[in-house]
């Protein structure tokens, strides 16, 4: 509710939409993320938040219609990620990592210690300890490659990618590596990315997360409303990076040539019908 109240306050305080220059108002209803992580997407708690957001968005649309008319604004609605269902609720093929995976990863640490005479190679997940690398006189890329081979043999691991591999840039024919590379930043990302088998939730205990390149962690809604948009549900593939070029096209704003994504054909009838 506070996010919606902030939207009304911003509309008034900054006179958004009062002239011919497009104004951008971006809202994030992040409560659903916190609830979803704790209780899962199929829980009554998540449903309660979704219904509340639906009401708040409906009220906001009514206010925008009142202020600017139905053709006086463009609106987009999406999410930044999907989510893995709670295995305890939906069952197979979804399952949670357990002692088998933990023991194997602990074995990787022991093997690296046996090879290089040092313990505690990983900090904060799959990031190699730079101080330990310097002490041992080893390069991160070489140790990461060793660790990747060891981790790839663990149960439930589909694939392991190193930071060096991602930095070189995967090809379009490798969709998993391509998806992971879009979340990779050399200065901030770990040295290893573990891609777990489909359905395996890499989280101990309770709750859920979105830490894979599988469709359930990536699929999000993409809704566009406004003048020039033909109503209907479209079946063709789209990506979240298409949203900015689409909004720009609807608003008549030029798009730089190097922007990722493409304007979606929202002005055409869905599926040609």
Regions found by a protein language model. Give the residues of each.
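His/Asp/Glu-rich, glycine-adjacent segments
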Residues: 1-23, 30-37, 152-159
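Active-site His/acidic residue clusters
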Residues: 15-53, 59, 90-91
């Amino acid at each position: 509710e506070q996010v919606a109240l902030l939207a009304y306050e911003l509309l008034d305080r900054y006179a958004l939409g009062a002239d011919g220059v497009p104004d951008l108002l971006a809202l994030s209803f992040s409560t659903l993320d916190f609830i979803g992580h704790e209780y899962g997407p199929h829980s009554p708690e998540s449903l309660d938040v979704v219904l509340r957001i639906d009401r708040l968005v409906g009220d906001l649309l009514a206010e925008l219609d009142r202020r600017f008319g139905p053709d006086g604004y463009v609106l987009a609605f999406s999410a930044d990620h999907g989510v893995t269902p709670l295995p305890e609720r939906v069952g197979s093929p979804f399952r949670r990592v357990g002692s088998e995976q933990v023991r194997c990863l602990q074995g990787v640490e022991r093997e690296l210690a046996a090879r290089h005479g040092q313990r505690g190679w990983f900090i904060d997940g799959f990031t190699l300890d730079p101080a330990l690398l310097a002490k041992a006189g080893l390069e991160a890329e070489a140790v990461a490659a060793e660790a990747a081979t060891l981790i790839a043999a663990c149960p439930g691991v589909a694939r392991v990618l190193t930071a060096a591999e991602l930095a070189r840039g995967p090809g379009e024919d490798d969709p998993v590596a391509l998806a992971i590379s879009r979340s990779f930043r050399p200065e901030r990302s770990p040295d290893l990315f573990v891609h777990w088998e489909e359905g395996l939730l890499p989280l101990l205990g309770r709750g859920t997360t979105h830490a894979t390149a599988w469709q359930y962690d990536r699929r999000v809604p993409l809704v566009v409303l406004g003048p020039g948009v033909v109503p209907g549900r479209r079946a063709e593939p789209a990506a979240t990076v298409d949203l900015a070029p689409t909004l720009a096209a609807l608003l008549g704003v030029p798009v730089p040539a190097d922007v990722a994504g493409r304007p979606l054909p929202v002005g055409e009838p869905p599926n040609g019908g």
